[in-house]
Amino acid sequence: MFSLLTEHWLPVVTRSGQTKKMSPQQLADDDIVDLAYPRPDLQGGAYQFLIGLLQTAYAPEDEDDWQDVWHEGLEGTAWRQALEAIAPAMQFGPQKPAFLQDFSTLESENSSISGLLVDSPGGNTLKLNKDHFIKRDSYQRFCPHCTAMALFTVQTNSPAAGAGFRTSMRGGGPMTTLVMPQNHNFPLWKKLWLNVLSQEQRPSLAELPLIFPWLAPTRSSEKAGNSVTPENAHSLQAYWGMPRRVEINFTHTEAGNCDLCGEHHSALLMQIRNKNYGVQYEGWLHPLSPYRQAVKAGSPLLSLKGQPGGLAYKDWLGLALGGEDKFNRTVPAEVVRAQSYRRFSPAEPFYLWCFGFDMDNAKARCWYEHRLPSLAIDKAAQSQFTNVVELVVALATGSLSLLKSALKEAWFETPKEAKGDFSALDIAYWQETEAEFRTLWSCLAQELPEESATVCTALRKWESALHQYLFVTFDRLALNNPDDNQALLRILTARRLLDKNYTKQKVLKDVKTLMAERKEVQGA
């Protein structure tokens, strides 16, 4: 057994670039600037683990307390004393209760420890010989340090895995959004503190089993009506969810190098035991994830998940400030909303670090990470900012639809009957038109739209770049057989129709009206 609070088990990078391992007790050290996990999902998991520690053991009482810590630093002695209050929940090893392991001894067959990795090939994948990218037996032996973080990461991201295997309280493969400083030399604790919320009081010893579910018999979910909700648990369990019943086999070990970090260890762990019908979470809103809700009355809030192609700039507004279209409204993560109200002196630029798996039920299709520009704009200007961005995104979305329709008209004699997969075009479109949008976003974030000539210029450049992209892309994809006169006529007709339909868009007229209004203000 070892304590996850005192053991030097977290790989970190110092200001000089040196890598070493630290214990959470050393988090107050300003010389430590980042974590250093070899896998991005473990890196993201480690950030969430440490944020959870800060939130649970050391949360500020109010905004003034938050600012005091930000400016004066984590006080080492107070931090270590705060961690002692949750020490019973942070023991890792074979003796129960143990960190994120089932309270009971599981009567199940042993399976490979690779099952702690979300992207490891499952039984059906192996049976059908479909492990093309992540091969079977790639991850068979983990050191205890990597095992602890892999266990936390799979519990917090838990995807669907068969009958009775519960997903995380955010669903399978949730997206996480953290506020991060542009200055990468900030100490690690400051990067974490940006994502800590104020709370009126810290938990008592008696409340620990309601926060850390492995400290008590598992509230299993074989029968309906036995879900864990914010009403029958502590709100801080959001950081320590345990949907999977897992037990690590500490008796079957061997010496060698860890398949995750590469370090030598005398007792590498190789097997785990799983059991279905673990904790079923209902009604939780995780502070580190954004949510989406259908505009239909009574629709639930659902956490955003990874998606094919990752995030695009059409998603930025919803993740940073919240947004709404004719189908859904997006609510930023609670930590992002809290950050938007803070003011820093001197001003500090931030970005949003968004990451998560794109899951197809139990199958991990891809891991995505994005760094999006965050916002620190005056509340009085937010409405104007939102209106302009929503117009611009609506123009981009509508224009993409017109481009796809025009390509079908150009490619097929009966386009209405033609079927096709435009996913590659969708991804390329949002990626290749992002640069001008990023410039516009930056202009809008820095200046009030109705007072800025820069915004007017950026709007014009954005619309011009979008228009040019549409026709360059159409020509590249459609004009591939100029010797076929009949096809050429069809292509040119489709091109003229694209130009006509683009110009007729109501949202384009709204954007041009906006540009004209700005021009009048500038000339006044």
Model segments located where?
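Short Cys/His-rich metal-coordination motifs, predominantly Zn2+-binding knuckles/fingers
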Residues: 143-146, 261
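Acidic (Asp/Glu-rich), glycine- and aromatic
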Residues: 143, 152-153
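Extended alpha-helical scaffolding segments
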Residues: 1-126, 153, 158-524
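Flanking scaffold residues of small Cys/His-coordinated metal-binding clusters
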Residues: 135-138, 252-253
